[in-house]
């Protein structure tokens, strides 16, 4: 299996996404004409089982952006312990994108290297680990984007879509150009779709975040949450996720994966003729 992925390379893992994106066993009844797009970035994974239960109960296909982050149990989000969890999500028909391997937060563009290649300064920080300041060339940043896709294919047998989310949403035109040259298109989130699960829970209690989301979210919005935030004392997902889902559905909204978003649909189908990664 490792040899198969090595031969396919990034093109096989990403460009096959349109042909091999996991499909649900049965599509939910009825057309989704007022969609919102629920997305999750990795985190400490403490609420990941709950998130999976809620999504399955309501037949929601979401989009996950993956980084190699520390977990509450002392492992990593993309280690062998979590491989079955990711395989199950893939089989349910969710979408997956890169969140960079080391959770690199862009700080600034640097002068080009001697060969003219773009360079960037990042703060790599994940969970409770000490931040690391490091400098990467465009080529090295490309490798940081590719590693989650390669690892995801290795542990699940499914390809990752050619999309990424920059940690903290911090980018520059040069960074986006470097990612695009590497085969990745950036996905952010809507202003109303910032669900606030990484905010201080004393200043932004769950009830307030839920009320705000239900009031402000509109069709077409991309929503952002996480699979566990170390710094939030009162976890968001147990209190807010299901009421948010049912509340938005009561307003006539529905949920769709990013492959159905008008901005990304063509991109995520672009590799329909490519050889797909295979299930192990």
Question: What is the predicted role of each segment?
Answer:
Residues 64, 96-98, 188, 225, ...:
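Hydrophobic residues in well-ordered beta-strands that form the structural core
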């Amino acid at each position: 299996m490792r040899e198969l992925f090595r031969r396919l390379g990034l093109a096989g893992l990403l460009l096959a996404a349109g042909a091999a994106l996991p499909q649900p066993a049965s599509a939910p009844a009825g057309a989704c004409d007022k969609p919102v797009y629920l997305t999750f970035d990795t985190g400490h994974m403490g609420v990941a089982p709950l998130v999976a239960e809620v999504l399955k109960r309501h037949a929601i296909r979401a989009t996950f952006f993956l980084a190699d982050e520390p977990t509450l149990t002392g492992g990593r989000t993309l280690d062998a312990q979590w491989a079955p969890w990711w395989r199950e999500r893939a089989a349910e028909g969710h979408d997956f994108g890169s969140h960079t391997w080391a959770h690199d937060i862009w700080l600034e563009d640097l002068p080009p290297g001697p060969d003219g290649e773009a360079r960037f300064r990042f703060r790599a920080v994940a969970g409770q680990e000490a931040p690391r300041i490091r400098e990467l060339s465009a080529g090295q940043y490309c490798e940081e984007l590719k590693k989650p896709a390669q690892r995801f294919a290795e542990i699940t047998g499914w390809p990752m879509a050619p999309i990424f989310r920059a940690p903290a949403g911090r980018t520059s035109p040069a960074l986006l150009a470097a990612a695009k040259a590497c085969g990745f298109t950036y996905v952010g989130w809507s202003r109303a779709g910032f669900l606030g699960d990484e905010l201080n829970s004393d200043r932004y209690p769950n009830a307030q975040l839920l009320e705000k989301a239900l009031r402000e979210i509109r069709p077409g919005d991309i929503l952002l949450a996480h699979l566990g935030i170390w710094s939030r004392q009162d976890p968001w997902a147990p209190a807010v996720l299901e009421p948010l889902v049912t509340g938005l559905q009561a307003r006539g909204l529905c949920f769709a994966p990013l492959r159905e978003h008008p901005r990304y649909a063509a991109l995520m189908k672009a590799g329909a003729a490519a050889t797909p990664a295979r299930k192990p």
